Amino acid sequence: MGKIIGIDLGTTNSCVAVLEGDEPKVIQNPEGARTTPSVVAFKNGETQVGEVAKRQAITNPNTIQSIKREMGTDYKVDVDGKNYTPQEISAMILQNLKSTAESYLGDKVDKAVITVPAYFNDAERQATKDAGKIAGLEVERIINEPTAAALAYGLDKTEQDEKVLVFDLGGGTFDVSILELGDGVFEVLSTAGDNKLGGDDFDQVIIDYLVEEFKKENGIDLSQDKMALQRLKDAAEKAKKDLSGVSQTQISLPFISAGESGPLHLEITLTRSKFEELSDELVRRTMGPTRQALSDAGLSSNDIDEVILVGGSTRIPAVQEAVKKEVGKEPNKSVNPDEVVAMGAAIQGGVISGDVKDVVLLDVTPLSLGIEIMGGRMNTLIERNTTIPTSKSQVYSTAADNQPAVDIHVLQGERPMASDNKTLGRFSLTDIPPAPRGVPQIEVTFDIDKNGIVNVTAKDLGTNKEQNITIESSSALSDDEIDRMVKDAEQNAEEDKKRREESDLRNEADSLVFQVDKTLKDLGDNVSEDDKKQAEDKKEALKSALEGQDLEDIKTKKEELEKVVQELSMKVYQQAQQGDAAGSNQSDVEDAEYTEVKDDDDKKDNK
């Protein structure tokens, strides 16, 4: 069985890991970094992913960031008249990580475990699975990020029983999970969170502050200038990171705008205390789900043995202090918050492939599931924090005499009224035989699989007629759409590969032309005019080919010039050897004369 890679598909950054022996290993990307920015850019028909896409975000409006926040919605990204779904953009990031893993392993990779925030609903999980499929990956398991982190933390601690609180504050989402670890069993007791809270929001409060200060001073609203906003975003992110280590940082953005008197510059000193004041509301928002998770698990903060911080945003000192104050324990800093989730996913891949033994993962569903009943109320079948996979059935009846069909409105959420919860889907059970109200017996069954994805079945117990659906939200993709996107992704990957090969070939050819010029200059009179002319002719032929689009011609001309350069180098090398040999012989003669003179002197001394 091939390797199953572990992928942390993050809002801001993503990470890929693989199990090597008993240890998960984070794979470096081609730039040598252990995480890859979750950024996709479209430029001149080419798709760019990661650091290269992030670097040109200021000047390229076709740059997409934080797409994870739109997963499970019907949001579309318009790029030069073509619409892309969040699944397609995420697939491009996954494809990049897949390629990184393949380069490292030297083998094809087609299976993965992908992590999602624990608080992701059904639509968001399904969208993540679809993204994997578009990227050419068979998603063996979708697991929750805090659970993955606990796996990585607790793999070598299976002898002792521990209750662990995982506090996961990423770029765009926030989760708290409480797990019990012991004897190789990782059981999630509860989970809570906020899918619209993360590092991006901490950046935003700095951006808002900078915009406000600049407007006060210069009367210009930078939030209306797209390019200025991107520069502010980059500066805010950097300032946030700086303030995790220092008490103040200088934000300097020259030529950010222009006024009547000329160019305007933004120069502001941001202190950690000011940042803490700006972000206080965000930090306090993380405490609600933390208390909720403890309450749902039936635990107090005194029952927690370890606190694990996950996600880059947990490096913010105010966040660490708030967690410490709430739980009453110093957070464990033995895990890397940016990498631990991918490492846990790789371990889960090892569990699935059989490489990791004696580890059992018991996860939970983050939100309650039920259907709408009379009066617009929600009737819950599966409570939140129920261990998955699970199945639950309940019998309902008709609301009117001779009712021929029932509509099943599937809901996810905690509110008593159906309209206040998220609709996962609707379907109908038809052809119910005429009968008085309350007589027909309709059994509704909810199934949640190991990925947290929901199937619902409705069955008329009188006729045994059955209707079922795998929940698909308005954002879900049909098999045909996924197949089309898979083909597009493969085609784009092939085209990108060709573009890269062309770029590499042209760069190598340019470099060779420069090298030939330098070599001929260095050799000077050591090369015959005929050899020089031949090299010059081949060089000009290659330069001419580079102006065209025929790659085969460039390749041929490059090889011809390389051959001439090799022959030149050989001749020069041989000449150098001959020169050394001649010099060596001359040296021997001089030594002999010296010896003879020495003998004469000796004779004189003897006289």
Swiss-Prot record:
GO MF annotations in UniProt: ATP binding; ATP-dependent protein folding chaperone; unfolded protein binding
Positions of the UniProt region annotated as Disordered: 490-510, 524-555, 574-607
Induction conditions: By stress conditions e.g. heat shock.
Keyword Nucleotide-binding in annotation: yes
Pfam families: HSP70
InterPro entries associated with the record: ATPase_NBD, Chaperone_DnaK, Heat_shock_70_CS, HSP70_C_sf, HSP70_peptide-bd_sf, Hsp_70_fam
SUPFAM superfamilies registered for this protein in UniProt: Actin-like ATPase domain (SSF53067), Heat shock protein 70kD (HSP70), C-terminal subdomain (SSF100934), Heat shock protein 70kD (HSP70), peptide-binding domain (SSF100920)
Sequence ranges of Polar residues compositional bias: 574-587
Modified sites of kind Phosphothreonine: T173
Translocase listed as a keyword: no
Residue ranges, compositional bias (Basic and acidic residues): 490-509, 524-542, 595-607
Annotated keywords: ATP-binding, Chaperone, Nucleotide-binding, Phosphoprotein, Stress response
Lineage: superkingdom: Bacteria
Known role: Acts as a chaperone.
Entry similarity comment: Belongs to the heat shock protein 70 family.
Protein name: Chaperone protein DnaK
Record gene name: dnaK
